UniProtKB/Swiss-Prot annotation:
Keywords: Amidation, Neuropeptide, Secreted
Family from the record: Belongs to the FARP (FMRFamide related peptide) family.
GO biological process: neuropeptide signaling pathway
Tree of life domain: Eukaryota
Protein name: FMRFamide-16
Amino acid sequence: AAAGDNFMRF
């Protein structure tokens, strides 16, 4: 999981 993907997760 990339940093950008983690942001979209929230």
